[in-house]
UniProtKB/Swiss-Prot annotation:
Location(s), subcellular: Host cytoplasm
Keywords tagged on the record: Early protein, Host cytoplasm, Host-virus interaction, Modulation of host cell cycle by virus
Protein name: GemA protein
Membrane-traversing stretches: none
A Pfam family matched in the record: GemA
GO cellular component: host cell cytoplasm
Quaternary state and interactors: Homodimer.
Length: 183
């Protein structure tokens, strides 16, 4: 880390630890024998920062991690869920043709018998219905898999049963990763 970055971080730590000027300078004097960051070497600055961390300072990331690096369209989500279901063994054909047939069957019910023949042509409310229906199907498959393997359904830290799509898929992936479920 650069000298300037270390000095900035030390000053952030000073504010976080609520050190007044006299206490801060006494702290520097105790750790390095000097009363100003300007007089310190990079090694000494690192020592001061480490000492502040020992006193309770925690460096927080300025920006929290984001779920997606870029915007993912509903159409891409449908495609990824379809492929994940195939990878998990819930459907036998994870290809585009099978997905298009599913979309056509699903949209035919809503459009009075005439379905959208491919995912690429599906827009708006129809696309949202396809996405949400596919997520619910995937959740049902995950619940059945937990039951089939004799595992309890995952619960939140408060003890409530998980219901959200992201939480259920993460729990299923964790169960497979830890080999609690055969792949």
């Amino acid at each position: 880390m650069s000298r300037t970055s270390l000095i900035k971080l030390i000053h952030v730590a000073r504010r976080e630890l609520q050190l007044d000027d006299d206490t801060y300078r006494a702290f520097l004097m105790q750790k390095t024998g000097k009363i100003s960051c300007r007089e310190l070497t990079v090694t000494q600055l690192e020592q001061v920062l480490d000492a502040m961390k020992e006193r309770g300072f925690k460096k927080l990331n300025k920006y929290p991690r984001r779920r997606f690096k870029e915007h993912v369209t509903p159409r891409e989500k449908v495609y990824k869920i379809w492929q994940q279901m195939a990878e998990d063994g819930f459907i036998t054909d994870g290809g585009d043709v099978a997905l298009d047939k599913y979309v056509q069957r699903l949209t035919a019910k809503r459009n009075g018998g005439q379905g959208v023949s491919t995912l690429a042509w599906c827009h708006g409310e129809s696309l949202q219905v396809v996405l949400e229906t596919l997520k619910q199907w995937h959740i049902r498959c995950i619940r059945e898999a937990f039951s089939r393997h004799g595992l309890p359904l995952p619960v939140s830290p408060s003890g409530r049963e998980l219901r959200g799509y992201d939480a259920m898929t993460a729990a299923y992936a964790h169960a497979r990763k830890t080999r609690r479920m055969a792949q």
